[in-house]
C-alpha cells in the first residue's frame, strides 16, 4: 500500500460502503467485507449490510458515472459443495440460516444484484469468486487454514486438520489474485 500512497494518481478514501458515496471514477473494485469468520461473525448484521447495501451503493455509483465495476465474491457461495471441483454453473449446497450465512448469503445476494443491474441497467459488471488467498502481511489470527498452519508450524506444534482429512481447498497467492482482478476488469 505504501508505494500506492506515493503515486500522484492514487487517492485513498476511507468510506463505509453501506452508506451512499459520490465520486467520479472509471472503475470500481468492490472488495468491502471481512472474509474471515473470526471477524465477520463479530457483527453479522453489519457484515450482510456491507455486502448487500455496499453492492447497491457501488452499483448505483457505477450506473451514474458509467463505470465498470468488479464484485469480489467468494468460494463460500458454494456452501458445502457436493461437487469437487465446482464449475461456475454449480449453484451450491448452502445453509441460509447458519452462523456463517451473514457472509455467504451476503455475497450471493451481491452477485444477484450485480447481474440484475447488468440486465436491467446495462451496468458493466464483473464477478470473481475468490478462494483462499495468502501472502505477505496476512493476519496471523484470522482463523483460516493457511495462517493456522503457518502459526502452528512456527510454534513447532502439530498441524490441525479438521474433519477426516479428505477436504480439498484451492489456494491463490495475493499477487496472482490482484493480477487476475485487473485482467478481469480489462475484459470486454
Located regions from the model:
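Amphipathic alpha-helical segments in well-structured domains
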Residues: 55, 146-147
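Activation segment of eukaryotic-like protein kinases
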Residues: 148-154
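N-terminal Rossmann-like NAD(P)+-binding domain of SDR-like oxidoreductases, especially those catalyzing
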Residues: 1-133, 153, 163, 174-186
Amino acid at each position: 500500500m505504501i508505494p500506492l500512497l506515493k503515486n500522484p494518481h492514487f487517492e485513498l478514501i476511507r468510506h463505509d460502503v453501506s452508506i451512499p458515496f459520490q465520486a467520479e471514477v472509471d472503475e470500481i473494485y468492490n472488495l468491502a467485507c471481512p472474509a474471515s469468520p473470526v471477524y465477520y461473525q463479530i457483527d453479522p448484521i453489519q457484515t450482510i449490510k456491507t455486502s448487500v447495501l455496499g453492492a447497491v451503493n457501488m452499483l448505483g455509483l457505477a450506473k451514474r458515472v458509467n463505470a465498470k465495476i468488479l464484485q469480489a465474491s467468494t468460494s463460500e457461495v458454494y456452501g458445502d459443495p457436493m461437487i469437487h471441483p465446482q464449475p461456475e454453473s454449480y449453484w451450491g449446497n448452502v445453509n441460509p440460516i447458519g452462523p456463517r450465512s451473514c457472509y455467504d448469503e451476503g455475497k450471493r445476494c451481491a452477485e444477484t444484484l450485480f447481474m440484475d443491474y447488468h440486465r436491467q441497467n446495462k451496468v458493466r459488471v464483473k464477478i470473481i469468486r475468490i478462494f483462499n488467498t495468502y501472502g505477505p502481511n496476512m493476519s496471523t489470527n484470522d482463523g483460516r487454514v493457511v495462517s493456522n498452519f503457518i502459526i502452528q508450524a512456527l510454534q513447532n506444534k502439530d498441524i490441525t486438520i479438521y474433519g477426516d482429512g479428505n477436504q480439498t481447498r484451492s489456494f491463490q497467492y495475493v499477487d496472482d489474485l490482484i493480477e487476475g482482478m485487473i485482467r478481469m476488469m480489462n475484459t470486454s
